């Protein structure tokens, strides 16, 4: 009688731990159910930080193998050499406005809705009929001319550098800046069309000739065109948002149009121009934070402040001259409630405050 067959034993390879599996390493937050690959600015990370920080990494953060993309005949990724400014940590900058995809659509949608309601109500109430001819001519020539400045800066200044900075946080802020400019230019264009349809005396095409040949606007036009020729993205941002916008943009929008419109029977224009001023306030907010970070950098702060002073010496005299070139338009409204000198003084005061905030020396010529 044969012996019963022995049960067959299965053999398994021995388990060998390689420390490549999940949960292999112990570190301070290894047992936490939440994980951040960056340090939030506050106790909890915001949605802005979650969708923005390190979306555009670099070899100093996470890309240990170096840039994984680039042009065949150029440097890879986003070279820091695209600006003369230097930073110990470009990723330190976080947009104080916390702009990301959702906020762009939400904020711009709200502004477009506001402008649309304003224009609809103006036509329904025949608000333009109460305007005097001098004010109608002022809007026809000057607000239309400023539309070209906004469009040019949005399309050829900010759009051109919205992927030049070394971090996604800076590029997002610049991209939103471009969207602000283009949307405001569009609002002014729609306003121009509405006035052309509502008032026979309003020439909706006059702004072209004014922008191209009116003596008072040629210095401003030259400034916008010169800005487009700057190759350094940080210099372009500095000269646009810190110098030009303060001495020319805000001077025209805030210190003239917003001040005299109501006295000339116009309550529509301040609503539209006010959206542009609100946009610029947000754009100035991120610009101030960025240049403040660079000016106070522990390693490169001194060199950056010298660089900013050099940019200031190159652009301030021209911007000041261009601001004074606009002086004739202060005499065009029928009700001249503000003078050019008082408007310029207010603009200079705000400009000095911005320079102080980013640790840039105030030019001696500012007080002359």
Curated annotation (Swiss-Prot):
UniProt subunit comment: The propane 2-monooxygenase multicomponent enzyme system is composed of an electron transfer component and a monooxygenase component interacting with the effector protein PrmD. The electron transfer component is composed of a reductase (PrmB), and the monooxygenase component is formed by a large subunit (PrmA) and a small subunit (PrmC). Probably requires the presence of the chaperonin-like protein PrmG to ensure a productive folding, resulting of a soluble PrmC, which leads to the active form of PrmABCD.
Keywords: Monooxygenase, NAD, Oxidoreductase
Record field: transmembrane: none
CDD domains reported in the protein's UniProt record: AAMH_B (cd01058)
Family note: Belongs to the TmoE/XamoE family.
Region (Disordered): 1-33
EC class name: oxidoreductase
GO MF entries: oxidoreductase activity, acting on paired donors, with incorporation or reduction of molecular oxygen, NAD(P)H as one donor, and incorporation of one atom of oxygen
Induction section of the entry: By propane and acetone.
Name of the protein this chain belongs to: Propane 2-monooxygenase, hydroxylase component small subunit
Gene3D superfamilies reported in the protein's UniProt record: Ribonucleotide Reductase, subunit A
Reactions mediated catalytically: propane + NADH + O2 + H(+) = propan-2-ol + NAD(+) + H2O; phenol + NADH + O2 + H(+) = hydroquinone + NAD(+) + H2O
InterPro entries reported in the protein's UniProt record: Ferritin-like_SF, MP_mOase_hydro, Phenol_Hydrox, RNR-like
């Amino acid at each position: 009688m044969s012996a019963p067959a022995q049960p067959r034993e299965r053999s398994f390879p021995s388990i060998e731990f390689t420390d490549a599996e999940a949960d292999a390493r112990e570190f301070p937050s290894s047992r936490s159910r939440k994980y951040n690959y960056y340090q939030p600015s506050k106790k909890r990370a915001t949605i802005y930080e979650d969708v923005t920080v390190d979306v555009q990494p670099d070899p100093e953060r996470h890309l240990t193998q170096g840039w994984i993309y680039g042009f065949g005949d150029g440097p890879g990724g986003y070279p820091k050499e695209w600006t003369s400014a230097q930073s110990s940590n470009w990723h330190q900058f976080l947009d104080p406005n916390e702009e990301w995809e959702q906020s762009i659509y939400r904020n711009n949608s709200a502004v477009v809705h506001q402008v649309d309601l304003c224009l609809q109500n103006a036509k329904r109430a025949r608000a333009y009929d109460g305007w005097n001819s001098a004010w109608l001519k002022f809007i026809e020539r000057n607000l239309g001319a400023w539309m070209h400045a906004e469009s040019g800066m949005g399309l050829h200044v900010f759009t051109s550098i919205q992927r030049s900075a070394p971090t996604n946080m800076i590029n997002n802020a610049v991209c939103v800046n471009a969207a602000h400019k283009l949307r405001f230019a569009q609002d002014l264009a729609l306003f121009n069309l509405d006035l052309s349809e509502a008032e026979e005396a309003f020439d909706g095409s006059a702004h072209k000739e004014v922008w191209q040949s009116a003596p008072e606007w040629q210095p401003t036009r030259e400034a916008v065109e010169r800005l487009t020729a700057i190759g350094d993205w940080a210099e372009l941002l500095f000269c646009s948002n810190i110098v030009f916008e303060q001495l020319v943009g805000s001077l025209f929008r805030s210190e003239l149009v917003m001040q005299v419109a109501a006295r000339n029977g116009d309550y529509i224009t301040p609503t539209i121009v006010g959206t542009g001023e609100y946009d610029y306030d947000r754009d100035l907010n991120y610009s101030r934070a960025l240049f403040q970070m660079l000016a106070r950098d522990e390693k490169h702060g001194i060199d950056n402040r010298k660089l900013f002073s050099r940019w200031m010496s190159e652009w301030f005299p021209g911007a000041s001259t261009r601001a004074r070139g606009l002086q004739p338009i202060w005499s065009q409204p029928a009700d001249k409630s503000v003078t050019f000198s008082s408007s310029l003084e207010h603009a200079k005061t705000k400009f000095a405050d911005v320079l102080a905030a980013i640790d840039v020396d105030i030019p001696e010529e500012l007080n002359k």
